[in-house]
């Protein structure tokens, strides 16, 4: 769903109306639900499995890291999280690039064997959210931020729909209050937000 399409703007307006109808303490839930709907409308539903794996792996690894008193064990969880999250991105986005290079090598050595391309469909915003979760895991490991204890809030941080379309890659420390704290309806801020989307 393009941010310049009528459907996106209709979706955004409905999302805003629902967001401000709900009590402030539940507004983050509205953001999560609208992000899930947006994801479902924008790409094949089965690609959501990759996003769910990223959410679960990031949540588990971040919270395991903080429990470890041994730095090496904490680093183990950091590495596991990065390998899983980056691995999904690499396989989905770059496996065909690797296959092409292998096929070129086969040709150079006179081999007729060719490996077929794989038809992967990557989730919306995979590059953005992968870089974001890696930065989050590094910040948790470095003690810059504490890990989010609520997996649904972690899901919102990773899958927040305005960021899935065009970024930016945001730090958890910068985003958590904006996502999880309630907000009062302020027309000037909504107008400013619309300007930022367009320009």
Give the label of every model feature segment.
Residues 1-199:
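Membrane-embedded transmembrane alpha-helical bundles that form the catalytic cores
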């Amino acid at each position: 769903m393009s941010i310049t399409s009528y459907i996106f703007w209709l979706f955004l307006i409905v999302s805003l109306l629902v967001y401000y109808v709900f009590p402030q303490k539940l507004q983050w839930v509205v953001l999560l639900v609208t992000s899930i709907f947006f994801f479902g409308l924008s790409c094949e539903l089965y690609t959501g499995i990759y996003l769910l794996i990223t959410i679960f792996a990031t949540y588990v690894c971040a919270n395991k890291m903080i429990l470890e008193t041994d730095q090496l064990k904490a680093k183990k969880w950091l590495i596991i999280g990065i390998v899983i999250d980056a691995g999904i991105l690499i396989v989905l986005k770059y496996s065909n690039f690797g296959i092409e290079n292998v096929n070129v090598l086969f040709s150079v050595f006179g081999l007729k064997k060719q490996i077929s391309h794989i038809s992967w469909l990557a989730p919306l915003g995979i590059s953005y959210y992968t870089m974001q979760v890696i930065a989050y895991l590094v910040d948790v490991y470095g003690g810059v931020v504490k890990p989010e204890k609520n997996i649904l809030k972690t899901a919102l941080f990773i899958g927040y729909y305005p960021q899935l379309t065009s970024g930016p890659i945001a730090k958890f420390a910068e985003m958590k209050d904006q996502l999880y704290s309630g907000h009062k309806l302020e027309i000037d801020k909504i107008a400013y937000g619309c300007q930022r989307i367009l320009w």
